Structures are given as C-alpha cells and as structure tokens.
Amino acid sequence: GKAFDDGAFTGIREINLSINKETAIGD
C-alpha cells in the first residue's frame, strides 16, 4: 500500500522539489 496519504506525500514532494531547486542553483 501507499506509505503516505496524499497530503503527506504532496508535502514531501514539495520539499524535495525545493531541495532540488536549491541544489541546482548551488551548482
């Protein structure tokens, strides 16, 4: 089954996107 409900998954995805953007800018 899903490890997270939709709300938690969306929150984590948004955090990951933010980290990815910061990493890209840092590079």
Curated annotation (Swiss-Prot):
<feature type="domain" description="Jacalin-type lectin">
    <location>
        <begin position="1"/>
        <end position="27"/>
    </location>
</feature>
<protein>
    <recommendedName>
        <fullName>Agglutinin alpha chain</fullName>
    </recommendedName>
</protein>
<keyword id="KW-0325">Glycoprotein</keyword>
<keyword id="KW-0430">Lectin</keyword>
<comment type="similarity">
    <text>Belongs to the jacalin lectin family.</text>
</comment>
<dbReference type="GO" id="GO:0019862">
    <property type="term" value="F:IgA binding"/>
</dbReference>
<keyword id="KW-0388">IgA-binding protein</keyword>
<comment type="subunit">
    <text>Tetramer of four alpha chains associated with two or four beta chains.</text>
</comment>
<comment type="function">
    <text>D-galactose-specific lectin, binds the T-antigen structure Gal-beta1,3-GalNAc (Thomsen-Friedenreich-antigen-specific lectin). Potent and selective stimulant of distinct T- and B-cell functions. Shows a unique ability to specifically recognize IgA-1 from human serum.</text>
</comment>
<dbReference type="InterPro" id="IPR001229">
    <property type="entry name" value="Jacalin-like_lectin_dom"/>
</dbReference>
<dbReference type="GO" id="GO:0030246">
    <property type="term" value="F:carbohydrate binding"/>
</dbReference>
